[in-house]
Amino acid sequence: MKARRGEEVMNQTIYAYISDGGIQEEISQGAGRIAGTLGLDNLIMFYDANNVQLSTKVEDVDAENVAMKYEAWGWKVIQINGNDVNEIRKALKEAKAEISKPTLIIGNTVMGKGAVGADNSCYENKVSTHGQPLSAAGASIADTIKNLGGDPEHPFTIFPEVAELYAKRAKELEVIVAERYAVKDVWAKAHPDLAAKMEQWFSGKAPQIDWAAIEQKANQATRAASATVLGVLATHVENMIVASADLSNSDKTDGFLKKTHAFVKGDFSGAFFQAGVAELSMACICIGMSLHGGVIAACGTFFVFSDYMKPALRMAALMEQPVKFIWTHDAFRVGEDGPTHEPVEQEAQVRLLEKLKNHKGHNSMLVLRPADVVETTVAWKLAMENVYTPTALILSRQNITDLPAKENRYQEALQAEKGAYIVNEDANADVILLASGSEVSTLVEGAALLRAEGIKVRIVSVPSEGLFRSQSKEYQESILPAGSRIFGLTAGLPVNLEGLVGPNGKVWGLESFGFSAPYKVLDEKLGFTAKNVYNQVKELLA
C-alpha cells in the first residue's frame, strides 16, 4: 500500500505480540522467515519470554536460541527486561528507527510477578499459575495485591499516577491523530483520483470488471481458464495481491504474475507474493492483508495441500474475510504423482464450511468447482463479488471439453450464480445426471449413449451445493424435482453428492485413495467414463 500511495497516507507500523507457545507454533516459522526475507521494517513484534507455558517450563520442550533464529531470518533483535517500562520505551524507539528489517523485542518477563501465598511464599514462574486463577494454584489474591502495593478491598482502583499518565497520553494521541488526518486531507486534495481509488479500496466493494468480455480458449483445463481471468484482474484491479506456495507455474497463478512482478526486499511495487513452500503461513498472511483492509488477497496451491491450510480456512470463515483460495489439481487425475498428491476427501472437508453458518447467518464459505472454461470465468465473478466470506475455487489439472451451449455459453453459465443449473435437457427427462467440475463433461458423453437408446436426460452442473441450497425452494425444485431419479458423478467421496441425489438416486465416486498412472488410464480403471455412466444409469433405471 505504501508503494502504491506513498508514505504520506500509508505510514503505519504493525505491532504483533507472541508468546513462548506462539514461538513454537509452525506458523511462526513461516511468518518469521517471510517477514525477514522481505525486510518488513514497519513490523515490530513483542515476545513475552517468561519461560513458562501451560503444561511445562519452556526449557523442557524448546532448547533453541530464539534471538539467533530471528537474526538468521534477517530480523533486528532487541533483548530487554520486559518488566521495566523504561527499557520497553527505549526498545520501541530503537525499533521505530529501523529502516531495513522487522524487529523482535524479546521481553524477558516474570510469570505471575509479585504473586504470593498467604504465608508470603513465592508463586512467580510457576507452571501452575499459567492456565488457572492464582487462587486455584494456591496463591492468595489478597496478599498478592498487597505485595504489589494495592488495596485488596479496592482491587480495581487506578493509581493516581497511572490515571495522570494515561490522560496525558490521550491528549498527545488526539494531537497526533489530528495531524495525521490533516496530512491525509492535504494529500487527497492534491491527488483526487488517487484518493477516490483509496476510498474504493477500503470500502470493501467489489471491483467493476467486464466479465462477459473475457475470452477463453476452448477446451482448456479450468486452471488455465483461471490464469486467463487472473491476467485480466492483474491489469484491472490495482489493489489485488495474489500469492502462491512455490507453485505459480503449476497452479497457474502465473497468469497474474506475468502481468506484474513479485515482491522482493526493497521493492513492493509488484502485486505477487511468492510465499515459498508454506501453505499455512501463506493463507494466514493473506488473511492478515484482508484484515488490514484495502487489499483483495488470493492464494494458490494444489488442492491436496489445502490440508495444511485448514486452520486458516476456519479462521477466514469465522472472521468473514473474503480471501480467495485457488486450488488446482483437483482430483485423482493428477496422475503419475500418485495418491499422495491426489485429493479425494478434501472436497468433502472443504464443503462442510458451506454448511456451517457464520455469525451473520450466511454460509461461512463459498466453494466453487467449475465445469469448463466459461464456468470458470463465472466462478471468478462470484469470487470477486463475494466480499463477505472466503471463496474457494477448485480447478482441474487436465483439459476439459467445453459444455454444450444453445446460444451464448457465457450467458448460460451465469446460471451458476445460483449454485446449480441445467446444462441441457430433454422434455420429460427419465433421469437427471448431476456433477461438478470435470465430471460434468463426462456426463455429457454418457448422456449421448443413453439418448441413443431413447432415454431422456437432464444434465445439471452443481459448482456449489451451498449456494444452491441458499436458493428458494421453488428454484431447487425446478432443478431437482422431488422423486426424480438422479445419478451423481464425483471424483471425490460419494458424500459430495449424496445429499442432492436423494433416496431415489445413486452416486458414483471414489471410496479409496488414488493411484499412480496416467489420468486417462485412471479414468478407465476407476469408472469415470461415458460407458460407465451409461451402465450405472441403466442399472438405476432398471
Please name every model-derived segment.
Residues 23-30, 280-284, 307-310, 440-444:
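Short glycine/serine/threonine-rich phosphate/pyrophosphate-binding segments
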Residues 19-22, 109, 247, 302, ...:
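Active-site metal-binding loops of divalent metal-dependent hydrolases
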Residues 157, 161-163:
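Low-complexity, polybasic segments enriched for Lys interleaved with small residues
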Residues 22-23, 51, 111, 249, ...:
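Short, glycine/acidic-enriched loop or turn micro-motifs at the edges of active sites
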Residues 21, 81, 276-279, 302-303, ...:
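Short loop or secondary-structure boundary microenvironments that flank
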